[in-house]
């Protein structure tokens, strides 16, 4: 028995060493520097349209775009709004809330498109990295700064994660709106993806592709299939951003909204607990941050007519944040 226990202990130790020295996943190396974009608004829109038209397999109506406050003048506005969608989604994930907010406050709106979003290629995300994932958000902010004197960034899900990163590195942002930000996924086992043997574990558990079962209309605006390399990248980015020392760097006004009714009826895509842990750690003064649960939204995606049963409530609460915290004056009354 003693020899057996010694043998068993040795085997466990050997397996532990083998796990620890297994293939590793590199840490994200994120650079906060924004890219340079033209300040000529006519040229800027043309460049966006041209680059989007060149994307192979981009599905109709998924392209990034500028929504002008005044289509006749197409000029810089006092405020601009940048919308950053979530993992594998599109601008439709925040529609119509982002458009209604932009109209109400007379703001130019930039609807960004992240790397590989909106394409029909089933291998989408096969080359996604934390660096090119974040690059899309940085370009969106650079465009937003060109479109408005002050920028408000709205992010949903993984777009909220990217928005948090932008807020820590660009304090000039006027305010951020986080709809169901993906600070951690609901199923915490994804954290294994960035541990030794993580890629192998992920491929064995999930397969090389994730395939969605969205209904036909929604599937036009969300990826139907993507490489699970994207999940690896998502976890790498969360590892880099979802940290207390990151949260305390955020000083500007923050609106946090999510779906939560009770322990059973809540967001089961991303972790509400992780959002609630983040909120008190933000460096933003208490008077400048708002946390709201939307129990009737019924879905992780709370600001889209495709998914949310209470996008109107989400919009109203965000308007109150704009009015009372950001001190923005409406220029239009929506019917």
Residue ranges of model-derived segments:
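Hydrophobic membrane-insertion alpha-helices, especially the h-region
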Residues: 4-20
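Catalytic nucleophile-loop/oxyanion-hole region of alpha/beta-hydrolase
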Residues: 119-147
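Short, surface-exposed "cap/lid" segments of acyl-processing enzymes
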Residues: 59-114
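Gly/Ala-rich beta-loop-alpha elbow adjacent to hydrolase catalytic centers
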Residues: 154-163
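Short beta-to-alpha linker loops that shape the active-site pocket of alpha/beta-hydrolase fold enzymes
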Residues: 113-118, 182
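Serine-hydrolase catalytic core
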Residues: 68-75, 222-298, 312-323, 329
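The alpha/beta-hydrolase serine catalytic core
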Residues: 32-63, 181-246, 290-294, 302-314
């Amino acid at each position: 028995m003693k020899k057996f226990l010694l043998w068993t202990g040795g085997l466990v130790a050997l397996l532990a060493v083998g796990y620890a020295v297994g293939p590793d996943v590199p840490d994200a190396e994120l650079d906060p520097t924004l890219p340079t974009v033209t300040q000529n608004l006519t040229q800027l829109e043309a460049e966006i349209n041209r680059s989007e038209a060149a994307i192979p397999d981009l599905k109709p109506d998924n392209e990034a775009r500028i929504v002008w406050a005044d289509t006749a003048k197409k000029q810089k506005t006092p405020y601009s709004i940048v919308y950053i969608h979530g993992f594998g989604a599109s601008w439709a994930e925040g529609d119509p809330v982002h458009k209604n907010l932009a109209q109400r406050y007379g703001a130019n709106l930039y609807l960004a498109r992240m790397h590989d979003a909106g394409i029909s290629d089933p291998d989408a995300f096969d080359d996604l990295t934390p660096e090119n994932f974040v690059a899309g958000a940085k370009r969106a902010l650079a465009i937003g700064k060109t479109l408005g004197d002050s920028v408000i960034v709205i992010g949903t899900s993984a777009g909220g994660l990217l928005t948090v990163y932008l807020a820590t590195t660009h304090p000039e942002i006027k305010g951020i709106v986080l709809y169901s930000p993906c600070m951690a996924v609901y199923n915490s086992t994804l954290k294994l993806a960035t541990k030794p043997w993580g890629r192998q574990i992920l491929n064995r558990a999930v397969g090389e592709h994730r395939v969605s079962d969205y209904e036909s209309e929604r599937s036009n605006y969300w990826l139907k299939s993507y490489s699970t390399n994207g999940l690896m990248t998502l976890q790498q980015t969360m590892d880099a951003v979802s940290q207390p020392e990151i949260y305390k760097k955020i000083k500007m006004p923050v609106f946090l909204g999510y779906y939560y009714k009770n322990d059973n009826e809540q967001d089961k895509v991303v972790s509400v607990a992780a959002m609630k842990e983040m909120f008190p750690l933000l460096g933003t003064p208490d008077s400048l941050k708002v946390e709201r649960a939307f129990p009737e939204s019924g879905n992780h995606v709370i600001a889209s007519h495709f998914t949310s049963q209470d996008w109107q409530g989400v919009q109203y609460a965000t308007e109150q944040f704009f009015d009372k915290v950001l001190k923005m004056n409406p220029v239009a009354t929506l019917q």
